[in-house]
């Protein structure tokens, strides 16, 4: 919005030309989202407390979590608000990639909101019925994936980028839709599963979004895309603005979500952020890179799958409790230790993922 306005005002004052620079807009996008989150935080927490929108804690969970019962949840609303406002202010409104991310972000946010509403208002610990949750998540993911396939069919936008192999970029055909579906829905659920400790999900999300900001910048620059042997996608550059907005909003939320948390993001935040990371990976053709950089989310999800599978097949559990962060809690690790160590692992994985762009 401001970019469009600046383009009309630059003829009156050349200083408005700074709005055309991607690096400038990326920085102010981050700062805008950060300040909105910090401003909304105390007000959102007070409002949620007044409405008695408190966290529902499982009785079979770690005893250390019982003290979290009643802590305001659905704080993801402030994350989404900060991201959407910042993106609308600083990104080019004509960019289709930006709108793809916003559709998934807002759509998954609405699904998460309904899920949280069932938990905190109707006191239903299971939340929204699973089949309906996955149905609407699938509708959004398949709708966006199908639209992208129709527009980008047989172009670099539907190629698969394989790490370590610079000349291996097969056209996916209709498999593009299926892959995109699993990436978007899978990442949404993976971040949701990871969101079980104070700050555990938001910081890896910030790290991955920051990594994708660099990838988006390179993908949208023909010279760097050719240098790194990745597809050049002319709309990808504006995803830098989206990614930095996620970073800013996430850091602002972390101010209130760090241990001991004053507010939790709830499904409205975790599903939306996960879906956003998934669609960003799809748009940048970096699904494999998401698996590497988002390794913490992958491990958390696999721990649940393995735990359920083992119990059904063998009647035995692999972990003391899943997702795996609860396993370490039950082993006696203090919650802050689990959180910070997972943060460190996440940062290392993002750096490793970025390194794979050059190792080809």
UniProtKB/Swiss-Prot annotation:
The chain crosses the membrane at residues 26-46, 72-92, 94-114, 132-152, 168-188, 199-219, 236-256, 263-283, 288-308, 338-358. It catalyses: UDP-N-acetyl-alpha-D-muramoyl-L-alanyl-gamma-D-glutamyl-meso-2,6-diaminopimeloyl-D-alanyl-D-alanine + di-trans,octa-cis-undecaprenyl phosphate = di-trans,octa-cis-undecaprenyl diphospho-N-acetyl-alpha-D-muramoyl-L-alanyl-D-glutamyl-meso-2,6-diaminopimeloyl-D-alanyl-D-alanine + UMP. It holds the Pfam family Glycos_transf_4. Its cofactor is Mg(2+). This is Phospho-N-acetylmuramoyl-pentapeptide-transferase. GO terms for molecular function: metal ion binding; phospho-N-acetylmuramoyl-pentapeptide-transferase activity; UDP-N-acetylmuramoyl-L-alanyl-D-glutamyl-meso-2,6-diaminopimelyl-D-alanyl-D-alanine:undecaprenyl-phosphate transferase activity. The gene is mraY. GO terms for biological process: cell division; cell wall organization; peptidoglycan biosynthetic process; regulation of cell shape. It is found in: Cell inner membrane. GO terms for cellular component: plasma membrane. PANTHER family: PHOSPHO-N-ACETYLMURAMOYL-PENTAPEPTIDE-TRANSFERASE, PHOSPHO-N-ACETYLMURAMOYL-PENTAPEPTIDE-TRANSFERASE HOMOLOG. It is an enzyme of class 2 (transferase). PROSITE patterns: MRAY_1, MRAY_2. It is a multi-pass membrane protein.
